[in-house]
């Protein structure tokens, strides 16, 4: 090829590219071409938008950590996860067989508006704003924030779908009693059971490595059991237990061993690797997931962004499960 032709080809390639895809995207299903080190940091470079028209899936941040019992900092989780997600936005999303955004319209809805000085109003604010998204018939993937946020999210989803099967990846059961006034990330499951918004008999918690006062009849997979099982066995257990019941998928990053997720508020040794958990998630395509979240990323305690990268990858897998379910309709 002549030097002039090569130069023209390079010019044509560059002309086809854009930067700041989160603002310049012409289509909700268009591919991004931002380099990983530059551009506006929406989740996987999806368009920043509050317009829910023709949207399949909404990614939303809730920067709240006032319920943390140990190390705070999860309010910075949504930003960290978005930043980490830039590493794989330009490529076909492994291990899925299709470009997740070729047919699934995904937007980054930004963050939940909260009054940082009035925590008692936080659950109602989260629930109301989540309902706005869900009422537009969009699937909601939320980035936390501490695990308290899952309670109002469950309320919003259950208002549409009825009691849900909770599929929870976590080192903690989060079943501590409260009086409905406490702001505590360790009690959201107890509240959800009490409120009748989850079905304990269909719910399952994976990776548990701490004690709690009550399991409410929820199926537990302890950390030592998870270590002894294959990923295929774990996923089959989840699918068999939940069945075809509508489910909510919540992933506390402290489910992972601190070697793979040090950047979190309440790390617990003895957990699984990111590789094993991703293998489990990839096999959960049979779940009827109605909503999902990734929580408890506290980047101040992270090293080389390993926690944020793990969380962004978990979130990407959740989008992959959603895309596969849409394509199967």
Which residue stretches match the model-derived regions?
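Basic polycationic patches enriched in arginine
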Residues: 3-4
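Conserved alpha-helical scaffold segments that buttress catalytic/binding sites
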Residues: 9-329
């Amino acid at each position: 090829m002549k030097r002039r032709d090569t130069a023209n080809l390079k010019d044509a390639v560059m002309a086809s590219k854009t930067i700041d895809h989160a603002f310049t995207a012409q289509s909700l299903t268009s591919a991004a071409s931002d380099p990983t080190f530059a551009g506006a940091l929406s989740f996987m470079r999806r368009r920043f938008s509050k317009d829910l028209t023709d949207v399949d899936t909404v990614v939303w941040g809730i920067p709240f950590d006032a319920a943390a019992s140990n190390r705070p900092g999860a309010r910075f989780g949504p930003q960290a996860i978005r930043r980490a997600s830039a590493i794989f936005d330009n490529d076909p999303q492994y291990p899925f067989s299709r470009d997740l955004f070729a047919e699934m319209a995904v937007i980054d809805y930004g963050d939940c508006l909260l009054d940082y000085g009035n925590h008692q109003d936080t659950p109602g604010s989260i629930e109301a704003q989540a309902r706005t998204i869900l009422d537009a018939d969009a699937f909601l993937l939320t980035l936390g924030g501490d695990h308290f946020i899952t309670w109002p999210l469950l309320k919003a989803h259950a208002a549409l779908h009825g009691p849900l099967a909770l599929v929870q990846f976590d080192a903690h059961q989060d079943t501590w009693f409260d009086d409905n006034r406490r702001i505590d990330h360790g009690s959201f499951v107890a509240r959800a059971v009490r409120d009748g918004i989850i079905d304990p008999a269909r719910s399952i918690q994976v990776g548990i490595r701490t004690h709690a006062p009550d399991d409410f009849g929820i199926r537990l997979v302890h950390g030592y059991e998870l270590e002894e099982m294959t990923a295929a066995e774990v996923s089959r257990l989840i699918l068999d237990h939940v069945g075809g019941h509508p489910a909510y998928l919540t992933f506390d990053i402290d489910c992972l061993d601190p070697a793979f997720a040090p950047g979190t508020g309440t790390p617990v040794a003895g957990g699984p690797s990111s590789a094993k958990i991703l293998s489990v998630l990839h096999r959960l395509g049979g779940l009827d997931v109605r909503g999902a979240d990734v929580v408890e990323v506290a980047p101040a305690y992270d090293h080389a962004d390993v926690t944020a990268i793990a969380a962004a990858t978990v979130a990407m897998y959740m989008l992959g499960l959603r895309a596969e379910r849409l394509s199967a309709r």
